Regions:
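Catalytic centers of nucleases
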Residues: 85-93, 124
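Short, low-complexity, polybasic intrinsically disordered segments
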Residues: 152, 156-198
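Catalytic cores of nucleic-acid endonucleases
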Residues: 115-160
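Short acidic, S/G/P-rich loop/turn micro-motifs used as interaction or catalytic elements
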Residues: 80-83, 107-110, 164-170
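Basic, amphipathic N-terminal segments that precede the first structured/catalytic domain
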Residues: 1-84
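Conserved catalytic cores of phosphodiester-cleaving nucleases, focusing on short active-site segments
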Residues: 91-93, 98-110
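Residue-level detector of flexible, active-site-proximal loop/helix-junction positions
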Residues: 24-27, 108, 197
Length: 198
């Protein structure tokens, strides 16, 4: 499935040069490099403090494609061409069974106020939602359904944050409502991890 999905992405996204990285080690790291304005996929633990760690016990092939600075030119807000600003996630990571839509928010400090953390989390949800809906639309317009490649249950939106905001069901109704709006718009459940097993 990963090869068919990858081939489809290559057909749909031809405007900007990007790399397709394929690795199959037991431990992998994806991280966002602000200096290079793109994400990287590596076996090196050098940047583990700001990485999404991928546990790959079966050592099967996992693919990484940078979205912001890869599929879409870094900083380009009107990538759809409708004269509106659209956000996008940082990268796609996928194998034959699951597709991860990843947004990194690793540059916050441990003592950052909860309101600021929530602002980062909320913005990350928007980034993932906007790109996911765009990706689905691009697939449909080309005659394919994204869900022919990955079912909703196997599409995992991940916000990679060291320090996540508190979300208590009774005290944070607004935050829970925002997460529910994300779920209603995408039919996906937002996750917050710094480590994930594929």
């Amino acid at each position: 499935m990963r090869n068919a999905f990858c081939a489809k992405v290559e057909l749909l996204f031809t405007d900007n040069p990007y790399d397709i990285e394929r690795l199959s080690d037991a431990i992998l790291y994806a991280y966002d490099c602000k200096e290079s304005q793109r994400t990287f996929f590596t076996t090196s633990a050098e940047f583990r403090e700001k990485s999404l760690k991928i546990i790959n016990n079966s050592q099967h092939e996992i693919v990484h494609i940078c979205v912001d600075g890869g599929l879409i030119q870094y900083g380009l807000e009107d990538y759809i061409g409708d004269a509106r600003k659209h956000a996008r996630c940082d990268c796609l990571i996928f194998d034959d069974n699951r597709l991860l839509l990843v947004e990194f928010k690793m540059d916050v400090e441990p003592l950052t106020k909860d309101k600021t953390l929530w602002g980062n989390f909320s913005h990350a949800m928007t980034q993932i939602k906007d790109f996911y809906l765009y990706l689905k639309d691009r697939f449909l317009k080309s005659g394919d359904d994204l869900h022919a490649f990955y079912a909703n249950i196997n599409i995992i939106p991940i916000i990679c944050m060291k320090y996540t905001p508190n979300i208590h069901p009774k005290r944070n109704a607004q935050r829970n409502n925002e997460k529910e709006k994300f779920r209603m718009a995408t039919n996906l459940k937002i996750q917050s991890f710094c480590e994930y097993g594929l």
